[in-house]
Structure formats: C-alpha cells, structure tokens
Regions:
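Short, charged/polar N-terminal "headpieces" of proteins
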Residues: 1-50, 111-114
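Bulky hydrophobic/aromatic packing residues
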Residues: 14-18, 70, 95
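C-terminal charged interaction modules
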Residues: 76-114
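Mid-chain, well-packed structural core segment of small domains
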Residues: 62-79
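Residue-level detector of well-ordered alpha-helical segments, enriched
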Residues: 58-63, 100
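Residues that form generic nucleotide/phosphate-binding pockets
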Residues: 43-46, 50, 65-66, 89-90, ...
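Secondary-structure edge/capping motif, primarily at the C-terminal ends of alpha-helices
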Residues: 50-51, 77
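Structural motif
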Residues: 51-59, 91-96
Length: 114
C-alpha cells in the first residue's frame, strides 16, 4: 500500500551534512529514521516526558534515538566511529547539524523511495 510509510521511515534515509562555515556539502553523511517510524514515535514520547518534568536534553536525546549511524565524520584526520555518546556530543556542540537534521527528518519525502 503506497500510504504505508512506517517501514520506509524505520529503515531510514541518509542526509549529507552542509558545512556551517561555507555552506558547501561535506563528505559527512548521517543515517536517520523518519517521523513515521516506530523509533521516532517512541523517542517523542520520551521527549514529552522530559518536557513535562522540565528536564534538559530532550531534543538531543530524540535525535540520538533516531540516528542509525554515520560515515565520513573525521576529527584530526581520523574517522569518528558512530556511537550514541558520540552522536550526543555532536548534536550538543554542532547546532547547525541538528537544524539540518530537524529539517530533513520532518520532510516525509526524504524517506520514500521511488
């Protein structure tokens, strides 16, 4: 059924990150799950619980939860291996990356093939 999008969103899609310095595409790609995925919906519930409890960090935790992996991220010339902790650190310290992710994830067409 062409209306069923949850599976494609769960599988994920890749965003190519743009440099905040010059606006050019980088060689850094992040694989994310979309807003129709079960993972995203579960993470949103956790985000809402934190919001109600007036706890910090809910937005970053949400992004970490829907990040499946990455490739091409380097630090001092060495590859940075994907891990939840590394993603958390990136998202806290690179607001330009998180805003690109927010825009990408909210566009359902990024997750639909064809």
């Amino acid at each position: 059924n062409t209306l069923y999008t949850a599976e494609a969103h769960e599988e994920g899609a890749e965003i190519r990150i743009v440099s905040p310095l010059d606006g050019k595409e980088t060689d850094f790609y992040i694989t994310l799950q979309g807003i129709d995925s079960k993972s995203y919906r579960t993470a949103v519930r956790a985000y809402h619980r934190k919001l109600i409890a007036e706890e910090e960090g809910g937005e970053v935790d949400l992004l970490v939860a829907i990040t499946k992996g990455w490739r091409g991220l380097k630090n001092n010339g060495k590859d940075v291996v994907f891990a939840s902790e590394a993603a958390h650190d990136l998202y806290v310290n690179a607001p330009s990356v998180t805003s690109q992710i927010d825009q990408f994830v909210s566009d359902r067409t990024n997750f639909i093939k064809g």
